[in-house]
Amino acid sequence: MKKFLAMLLALAMVFALAACGQSAAPAATEAPATEAPAEEPEEIIVFAAASMTETLNQIKEIYEKDHNVTITYNFDSSGTLKTQIQEGADCDLFISAGQKQMNQLDITADKEINTDGLDFVADGTRINFLENKVVLVVPEGNPAGLEGFDDLAAKLADGNVFMAMGNSDVPVGQYTQKILAYYDLDEEALANAGTITYGTNVKEVTTQVSEGSVDCGVIYCTDAFSAGLTIIDSATKDMCGQVIYPAAVLKTAQHAEAAQAFLDYLTGDEAMAIFESVGFSPVA
């Protein structure tokens, strides 16, 4: 009986010690949750006509705040951009200041224009994006006293004015060539006579006028607005046609979906308000 009581006492002590040990053990703590690393933003590479520099840079700031992307722009003449794309430059989205340069990259375009059979434009992405106006601008004070395109044509014929225009592979230069042809003026003869000078893109022409190194220049309405230049006349459709800016995602795009999403945004109300504030308009 004594042995039995001793065994019970021993067991009771074992259970008591076990309970004490259990209560003394520190409470388990959960490991702090770690946040998943943020995804790297996608880079969208946009090749755009130089005349869109100010508006697209403004839109970039807005768009990047609300989307996990970084936008890298390459602004230049549409002809230069087309050549860079053709030579293999990385580009997701192309916005041209003229149909010709886009057509030269579009396999569905007239073969007389796309003479190399280039196939860069992604199916179903090409749109007529914006419309601009071709205008005649003068430096401060209008030193040549120009009154409009009719007056310009007469003074060019007489050699009494010095005009800046885009060269032949720049859309604004091609529009100017149409204006000269409208007035039956010989561009080559004018160049040889020293009455016209050239810029490699519309920004160069704008700068020549702003600095007063020429009597006038033919540029886009939007560039005149951005540079604060005086517009004395606007070209009609009969003079140079409609000035349409096409845009398209490219087949070689590394971030095609992000580029398409950005193009969709550019056609929306928020972005269009910025374009319209400087003289662009939706295509009618």
Say what each PLM segment does:
Residues 1-11:
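Positively charged n-region of N-terminal signal peptides that target proteins for export
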Residues 15-19:
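C-terminal motif of bacterial Sec signal peptides marking the signal peptidase cleavage site
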Residues 21-23:
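Bacterial signal peptide processing site
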Residues 27, 31-64, 79, 98-99, ...:
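Exported/periplasmic ABC-transporter solute-binding proteins
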Residues 78-119, 225-228:
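Pocket-flanking alpha-helical
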Residues 120-125:
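Short, P/G- and charge-enriched loop/turn segments at secondary-structure junctions
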